[in-house]
């Protein structure tokens, strides 16, 4: 008798979208027939404004396709998901097209996942790898992180139109750099001593990704549309997605994203982007390694990152996150969320308490020798 998948030790990898289209002015040309004849377009207001002309030219070739346009609100929250699912059912939607940044695409992917519909993603910034991944993050209506949802599949297609990305605010690319950098600093820890060939390859891909960003980010920001810019855009959307897709759960998040999740529970956190919080979280993760393990390698890595952060405008400290006004009690609340029992911070090879994390959060830009390990 054959065992069912649930009875087997099965490693699942969802490495990539079904198809990845990359180019300039391609949104109006790429076939969208996979979505069927009744399509729901979900996106942010700015993103829909930017993408709508090209999409309308695309669908003008097929007048029988009915298009329904809607914004997703502010967050990928359960209330928004329920509203959009009801709309899709009411309109007998046959496919979902997600347009925008990370939260818009996460929303579109999760609606498609729940309704078992095809999904095509169209990123309008390089702020995250959401257009690539088989994962959606769910937030409360006030923007506090609640959980992530692993999807059954990556998008059926990803349309990366560089002209759309070039129109995005430069800050979104900076945030994407911060989010993508975390792939190395987290996957190199979360992968442990894995002997799985795909995990090993994913971690090495994360190293390549990190090096590309360290070397090319400043040039990319100085010349939007140039060679370095295109490489960094591809790195933030595609290479970062490959790491998580190929490595699976072994190559996902650790302390950097746990810090992000904790910070989302603070008032005022909406002033910063996902990747900015994650970038700050990388520094906090490295500080934990310094504080709790006395790691000189972590100090060297943090020093290297701080120089890049200064060059491109990523946050070095709580002041840069517009959170310097918060007291220890409020910051400890964020640290407690980040250290909950099911938090990815516990993928670190040493125990972390909220009190230790609080020290790390308040000393991310500390320079010089690592102080002695505090009694926490």
Segments predicted by a language model, with ranges:
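Short alpha-helical scaffolding segments that buttress acidic/His motifs in well-ordered protein cores
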Residues: 177, 181-185, 229-243, 282, ...
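C-terminal charged capping/lid subdomain of soluble metabolic enzymes
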Residues: 2-7, 295-376
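A short, small-residue-rich loop immediately preceding and capping a beta-strand
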Residues: 88-111, 115-126
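A glycine/threonine-rich phosphate-anchoring loop and its flanking beta-alpha core
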Residues: 18, 113-205
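Active-site segments that bind and position negatively charged phosphate/pyrophosphate groups
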Residues: 195-311
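Short glycine/serine/threonine-rich phosphate/pyrophosphate-binding segments
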Residues: 49-52, 103-110, 128-132, 252
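ATP/NTP phosphate-donor binding region
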Residues: 1-95
